[in-house]
Amino acid sequence: MNDRDAWARLLAGAVAERSDQSRRICDLCVEMLGVTGAGISLVTASGNRGVVCASDDVAARIEDLQITLGEGPCVDAVRSGAPVLVPDLDNPEDVAVGRWPAFMEGAGTAGVRAVFAFPVRVGAAGLGALDLYRASAGALDGDQLGGALMAADAAALALLELDVGAGGAFPDGLGTGSAYHSQVHQATGMVQVQLGVTTKEAFAMLRARAFAQGRPLLGVATDVVERRLRFAAEDR
């Protein structure tokens, strides 16, 4: 990726599409930026968290892992408002390696060796993060880094098209991630009713259960929705 104007046109075309804008941005990152996979996660100040889209199953697992654990490059990028670049997850001298113990274990199991997270923001408001991963260690070069920053800006435009965070609810129409949001949102509401807690507390309980069982958040949410799992008072 060495033609910034051409890259900008590709991203603009993705944002202009009538559906799956976020997924198209992820796919373009894989095609053009020399990475194995890409994903976009929603993390807002109102408490919305979820996987918007992912280019493949591994990317989806990495996104879900960070949402479930509340740690990882995506979370740090959103909190700091700055890119988090880890070109070698096996490098013990990288401070991030010690900062995300649970994420590191899951990423290693998934075969991820490098991760790069870019905050998706509009001004001072954070919407989430664009995450890129590689199956082999290696830093992004200057062109790739610049391209990723442009992709994060495009992701912000795509999410704004969906009115992300409006009303404190997950928006409809999040492309391939819509089923994820619908299931997690429904499960959160069911746990909220079962225990008489706030939406934020109910979502935290879902995350805690997924972490304790070593399962994806979506799997636990599906069990709740399909009534295979019910939260009781002792779970509070």
Kindly give the residue locations of the regions a language model identified.
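Short hydrophobic beta-strand micro-motif common in sensory/regulatory domains
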Residues: 114-121
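Signal-transducing coiled-coil/dimerization helices and immediately adjacent hinge/linker segments
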Residues: 164-236
